Structure formats: structure tokens, C-alpha cells
């Protein structure tokens, strides 16, 4: 009987741990989506800026800087997309564990 109580207690602790991790992942995903949107807006801004700048010698240097900044922002967007996919995958796995955990404790 005591082992059953201990096991149930540890099962509840594990359930809480998984549930908290799942919620944390969801918050990180939302945060990354915001970062993706922000950086996509920066990419558009820099694209518009490049369209308006005239191609004089001194401005060419500015265009090179803008192009480099744009590439940096695009790289960040890609990194956040990859990170978001990884977080989503882990969240799905935790959801499955929680579902299986609930089903096994009900039986």
C-alpha cells in the first residue's frame, strides 16, 4: 500500500514537471514568433530603405551596410524558425506523455 502511495506521489510530481515544461515551451514559442515578426519587419524596412537610397559613391557604402544588416536579420529569422520548430517538437512529445500519463492513471 505504501509503495502505491509513493508511486502515485512520484507520478503526480512527474505530471506537474511535464506540464510546467510544456507551458514554458509554449511561452518560448510565442516569444520566438514575436521575434520572427519583428525581424521580418526589419527585413522589409531595410528593403524599402535600399529602394530609396541613390547609388552615389558615398551611398554605395551605406547600401553595403544595409545589405549586411538585412542578411543578419534574415539569418536571425531563420534561426528563430528552427528554434521554434525544435520547441514545438518537444512540446508535442510532452503533450503525448501527458496524455499517456493521464490514461495510465485512469486505468
From Swiss-Prot:
GO CC annotation? cytosol
| Coiled-coil residues | 70-104
Return any one Pfam family short name.
DUF496
Keywords per UniProt: Coiled coil, Cytoplasm
Answer yes or no on keyword Coiled coil: yes
By its UniProt entry, which NCBIfam families does this protein fall under? PRK05423.1 (NF003844), PTS_reg_TmaR (NF040881)
* Similarity comment text for this entry: Belongs to the pole-localizer TmaR family.
Q: What is this protein called?
A: Pole-localizer protein TmaR
Species this chain originates from:
Blochmanniella pennsylvanica (strain BPEN)
What is this organism's lineage?
Answer: Bacteria, Pseudomonadati, Pseudomonadota, Gammaproteobacteria, Enterobacterales
Gene designation per UniProt: tmaR
